[in-house]
A protein has these predicted regions:
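Intein modules and their embedded homing endonuclease domains
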Residues: 1-86, 121
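P-loop NTPase catalytic core of nucleic-acid-dependent motor ATPases
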Residues: 67-128
Length: 128
């Protein structure tokens, strides 16, 4: 069995083994989650050599970034997930209309606010 570490669904976080699974939701979609797993079960199912291939992390961290996402940061697994869409140039008349309705005369401030949320998700912003 020649599994690459990225293909192995198991992770070791600190001293715990976790399995990455797709959890089914009632709406028919799935979300990825981590569930605890037993190391002895892994040995029985795959052999002791398999355990050496499991990716190891010291713990979890949460570092949001939409432009420079990193799954691993200094030996820690980032719990923040990348967003599935990326901005593209072009016209957006319907979104512009909704934002104009929400922000009114201050729509330019709304554009700046949304841009900051995307580019600098760690920056503290006022509640609008």
């Amino acid at each position: 069995m020649k599994d690459k570490p990225s293909e192995i669904p198991y992770l070791r976080i600190g001293t715990s083994i976790l399995k990455r699974v797709l959890l089914p939701l009632s709406n028919g979609q799935n979300i990825e989650t981590l569930i605890p797993w037993n190391v002895e079960t892994l040995r029985q199912d795959f052999g002791k050599d398999y355990i050496a291939k499991i990716l190891k992390y010291d713990g979890f961290c949460t570092v949001p970034s939409h432009t420079d996402y990193q799954r691993e940061i200094h030996g820690f697994l980032n719990r923040y997930e990348p967003i599935s869409t990326a901005p593209v140039e072009g016209e957006f008349p319907h979104i512009r209309e909704v934002l104009a309705h929400i922000f009114g005369e201050q729509v330019e401030l709304g554009y700046d606010y949304l841009q900051l949320l995307y580019l600098r998700p760690q920056q503290r912003l006022p509640i609008l």
